[in-house]
Amino acid sequence: TFEPNAEECIVDGRCKHRSDWPCEMSSGTTGRCDVSLGACGCSN
């Protein structure tokens, strides 16, 4: 599942996907920041 525009994944205007940054999905589970179709978001 990919949830775009996860604010916690964006630091200083850049998506933190390359550093395997953790993030919280809307379901409450922990995911990892990712980029999909040019959007930064949280993915599990």
Curated annotation (Swiss-Prot):
Superkingdom in the source lineage: Eukaryota
Cysteine disulfide partners in this protein: C9-C33, C15-C40, C23-C42
Tissue expression summary: Expressed by the venom duct.
A molecular function (GO) term: toxin activity
Regions crossing the membrane: none
Keywords: Disulfide bond, Gamma-carboxyglutamic acid, Neurotoxin, Secreted, Toxin
Residue positions, PTM 4-carboxyglutamate: E7, E8, E24
One GO location term (cellular component): extracellular region
Signal peptide: none
Localization terms from the record: Secreted
UniProt comment concerning the protein's domains: The cysteine framework is IX (C-C-C-C-C-C).
Protein name in UniProt: Conotoxin Cl9a
Organism listed in the record: Californiconus californicus
